[in-house]
């Protein structure tokens, strides 16, 4: 599978940020690996069109709080910054698109919010951006978290993807002792 990635890495970046975060190839390799990992496990929901495609296409944009607030206000009627927004193309695809290339949609991430969250969680910006990109990707693939159970399953899959993705299995969310904010993402 190939990935046609439209990367808008305009920033705002700081001189301390790893240069790999603005390299298209870095994100292409990561995203293809994650998509193939999900497609390889029939127990994980993923549109068949994606798994059958020779090529997938998506946009990834790194921006600031002001821009993501405007997008969040326009598309979700929430006039506040958020960490990641996803605009899925598959939800609106009429009929059966050409499976040679499937447009997934766009992921928009606020670097300002990502930096704050990385600091709050005690990890680096690279880890936070990988977390947010994986979350956005899952939304593009049809995942959602309207309740705690589905959010826990989604977050578990994100952790497994970030940890290498081998033998991805979602644990029974009822066996997980955790409290999560369903509206956090």
From Swiss-Prot:
Molecular-function GO terms, alphabetical: metalloendopeptidase activity; RNA endonuclease activity; zinc ion binding
Chain sites annotated for binding Zn(2+): 135, 139, 145
GO cellular component: cytoplasm
Location, primary (coarse class): cytoplasm
Keyword field: Cytoplasm, Endonuclease, Hydrolase, Metal-binding, Nuclease, Ribosome biogenesis, rRNA processing, Zinc
Localization terms from the record: Cytoplasm
Residue stretches spanning the membrane: none
PANTHER family listed in its UniProt record: ENDORIBONUCLEASE YBEY, CHLOROPLASTIC (PTHR46986:SF1)
The protein, known as: Endoribonuclease YbeY
Originating species: Parasynechococcus marenigrum (strain WH8102)
């Amino acid at each position: 599978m190939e990935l046609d990635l439209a990367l808008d890495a305009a920033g705002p970046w700081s001189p301390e940020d790893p240069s790999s975060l603005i390299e298209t190839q870095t994100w292409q390799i990561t995203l293809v690996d994650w998509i193939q990992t999900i497609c390889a496990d029939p127990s994980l929901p993923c549109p068949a069109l994606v798994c059958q495609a020779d090529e997938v296409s998506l946009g990834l944009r790194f921006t600031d709080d002001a821009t993501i607030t405007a997008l969040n206000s326009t598309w979700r009627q929430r006039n506040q910054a958020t960490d990641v927004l996803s605009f899925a193309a598959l939800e609106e695809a009429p009929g059966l698109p050409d499976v040679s290339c499937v447009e997934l949609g766009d992921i928009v991430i606020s670097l300002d919010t990502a930096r704050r969250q990385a600091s709050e969680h005690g990890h680096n910006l690279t880890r936070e951006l990988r977390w947010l990109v994986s979350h956005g990707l899952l939304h593009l693939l049809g995942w959602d978290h309207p309740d705690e159970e589905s959010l826990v399953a989604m977050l578990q899959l994100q952790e497994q993807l970030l940890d290498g993705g081998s033998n991805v299995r979602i644990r029974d969310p009822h066996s997980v002792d955790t409290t999560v904010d369903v509206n956090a993402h």
